[in-house]
């Protein structure tokens, strides 16, 4: 096991500035090369303080923005047009990037595709739901209407 300092938010692991203990291979092969984390060291403690200070400064402004975005997301149904065969079965499935693009095109706002969680794979037309984690404490549930392209 090795200690790493997260530099970006990693789903299921933590937020920027958190010190977490992960398996050696996970840190060496994924987190560090992708830039999601740095190896923990005593000098890294200063980096943690800087990351946390920057996050605290951003949080005050983003709480209101996140609440506003949440209300806009939950008030509107996002329409996705995808290729489908007979019976409403999709060719492939709806991905988080498709949802993020549809949200942006509908004029609601920008959403990071990594923050979108789809509980069950969307492989058919119809109405579905997905959740978007805007912040650690603010989660929006959006309604999706998947329709077949003509």
Curated annotation (Swiss-Prot):
Organism in which the protein naturally occurs: Clavibacter michiganensis subsp. michiganensis (strain NCPPB 382)
Signal peptide: none
Coiled coil: none
Function: Binds to the 23S rRNA.
NCBIfam families documented for this protein: L9 (TIGR00158)
Protein name, entry field: Large ribosomal subunit protein bL9
PANTHER family: 50S RIBOSOMAL PROTEIN L9 (PTHR21368)
Gene name linked to the record: rplI
InterPro entries: Ribosomal_bL9 (IPR000244), Ribosomal_bL9/RNase_H1_N (IPR009027), Ribosomal_bL9_bac/chp (IPR020594), Ribosomal_bL9_C (IPR020069), Ribosomal_bL9_C_sf (IPR036791), Ribosomal_bL9_N (IPR020070), Ribosomal_bL9_N_sf (IPR036935)
Keywords per UniProt: Ribonucleoprotein, Ribosomal protein, RNA-binding, rRNA-binding
GO molecular function: rRNA binding; structural constituent of ribosome
